[in-house]
Amino acid sequence: MRFCSVFLVFGLAAAMGVSHAADLPPRESYQRPADIPSPPDNPLTIEKAALGKTLFFDPRLSRDGSMSCATCHNPGMRWSDGRILPLRADGVEHARRTPTVLNSAWLTTLMWDGRATSLEDQAILPITTAHEMNFEMPLLLNRLKDVAGYAPLFARAFGDAEITEKRLTQALASFQRTLVSKLAPFDVWVEGDESAMSERAKRGFAVFKGKARCATCHSSWRFTDDSFHDIGLPSLDPGRGARVPPQVTIMQHAFKTPTLRDLPRNGPFMHDGSMHSLDEVIRHYEQGGLQRPSISAEMKRFELTETEREYLIEFIHTLDGGLLDIEPPQLPE
């Protein structure tokens, strides 16, 4: 499905020796794809995405009716929650920050530790986890069946009004696949408009690809390699390491590389929300992180000048396309 059709339906470097665009890295690898991917057993349709949107915003998906998917993945907060750490159902803070769901159609593993391998699989986890939405799936399905307004929505999406776990997760996944970040100044520059990025931002891109080596992990048009790395934060959270044999040292304390799309206004940063500015994040990488056996081989010390740091931050701001024009739906009764 083309980006434009989905959005219509939903309303939806002097300091571095770089001074000309021709000196910058090739742009082709940063071009956005024309289509949103979906699995063969759950092709993306407008009707499924519309149902998924309604479910995403419905707090009745939680046991006590107080929490929807949008509670933590708030469209007004770049599909995160703006908190250092989100609150569990019992009022205790989670150990990990709420990641954005933007551009999740392209993910092959989801959640900070990669425990889910598809959006369909991921959709079940927060609903049924005791300290999140805390609902048993059979009870949830019965609750939805008691809401008369859901039957026609399921019928339009799937051909009949049967409400099942598979259909629930397919609809939620379909809606999330439509959440694609808007065109940012960087994208306009990639397409050839030199005026879309300032000279300072272009120099920052050169720092990003060169001296700072950010692109080693923050690659492709989504600015992530979809892999897991220990970047030397002091947290003792095992991350991906809890899901692989302990002898796989490199995965201990490793977390999924987050996208940099729409990042500047989506802080705080890191999986544990421990950093509050892009300057703080960059300085962490300059210092090389906490040295331990699992630390990524890419975590090598380097030093930027204050000007280079400013250029780099200005470049990262060009990856911000702004808020999606998505209004909460009217919930069925």
Curated annotation (Swiss-Prot):
Keyword Oxidoreductase in annotation: yes
A Pfam family assignment: CCP_MauG
Subcellular location, principal: periplasm
Residues reported to bind heme c 1: 69, 72-73, 271
EC number(s) from the headed UniProt entry: 1.-.-.-
A GO molecular function held by the record: electron transfer activity
Posttranslational mods: Binds 2 heme c groups covalently per subunit.
Keyword terms: Electron transport, Heme, Iron, Metal-binding, Oxidoreductase, Periplasm, Signal, Transport
UniProt subcellular location: Periplasm
Pathway involvement of the protein, from the record: One-carbon metabolism; methylamine degradation
One cellular component term from this protein's GO annotations in UniProt: periplasmic space
GO biological process: methylamine metabolic process
Lineage top rank: taxon: Bacteria
Signal peptide stretch: 1-21
UniProt keyword Lipid metabolism, yes or no: no
Residues annotated as binding heme c 2: 214, 217-218
Protein's job: Involved in methylamine metabolism. Essential for the maturation of the beta subunit of MADH, presumably via a step in the biosynthesis of tryptophan tryptophylquinone (TTQ), the cofactor of MADH.
PANTHER family: BLL6722 PROTEIN (PTHR30600:SF10), CYTOCHROME C PEROXIDASE-RELATED (PTHR30600)
Protein name: Methylamine utilization protein MauG
